[in-house]
């Protein structure tokens, strides 16, 4: 499965199949959340939140790829990510793109 954020894959003719997406909502353990609150007071990277967002992007991408595979896709083009806070310490990540088949 080829994943790109462009509307083409070099050297391939594409047949559009469908839009595909994946999403997840992730949160951190309350103990880690409290540690991150203190971290905002002194500055620096919020590693627990950074790790949470990286994990969320990976899960959402996996779900999008699984949806594309069910369609028989060879790739996904025009991939875009979006995220939003749904509550304190929890975030939703959604990824979407266009599933394509090589002609």
Predicted regions mapped to residue ranges:
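N-terminal presequence-like segments and the immediate start of the first folded domain
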Residues: 1-32, 70-74, 93-103
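Short, solvent-exposed loop/turn elements at beta->coil junctions and helix N-caps
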Residues: 6-9, 81-86
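Short, well-ordered alpha-helical segments
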Residues: 20, 25, 33-80
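Membrane-proximal amphipathic alpha-helices
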Residues: 86, 91-92
């Amino acid at each position: 499965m080829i994943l790109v954020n462009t509307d083409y894959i070099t050297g391939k003719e594409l047949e559009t199949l469908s839009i595909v997406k994946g999403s997840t909502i992730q949160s951190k353990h309350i103990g880690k959340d409290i540690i991150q609150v203190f971290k905002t007071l002194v500055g620096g990277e919020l590693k627990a939140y950074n790790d949470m967002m990286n994990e969320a992007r990976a899960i959402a991408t996996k779900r999008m790829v699984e949806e594309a595979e069910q369609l028989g896709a060879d790739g996904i083009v025009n991939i875009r990510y979006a995220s939003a806070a749904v509550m304190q310490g929890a975030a939703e990540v959604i990824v979407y793109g266009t599933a394509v088949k090589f002609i």
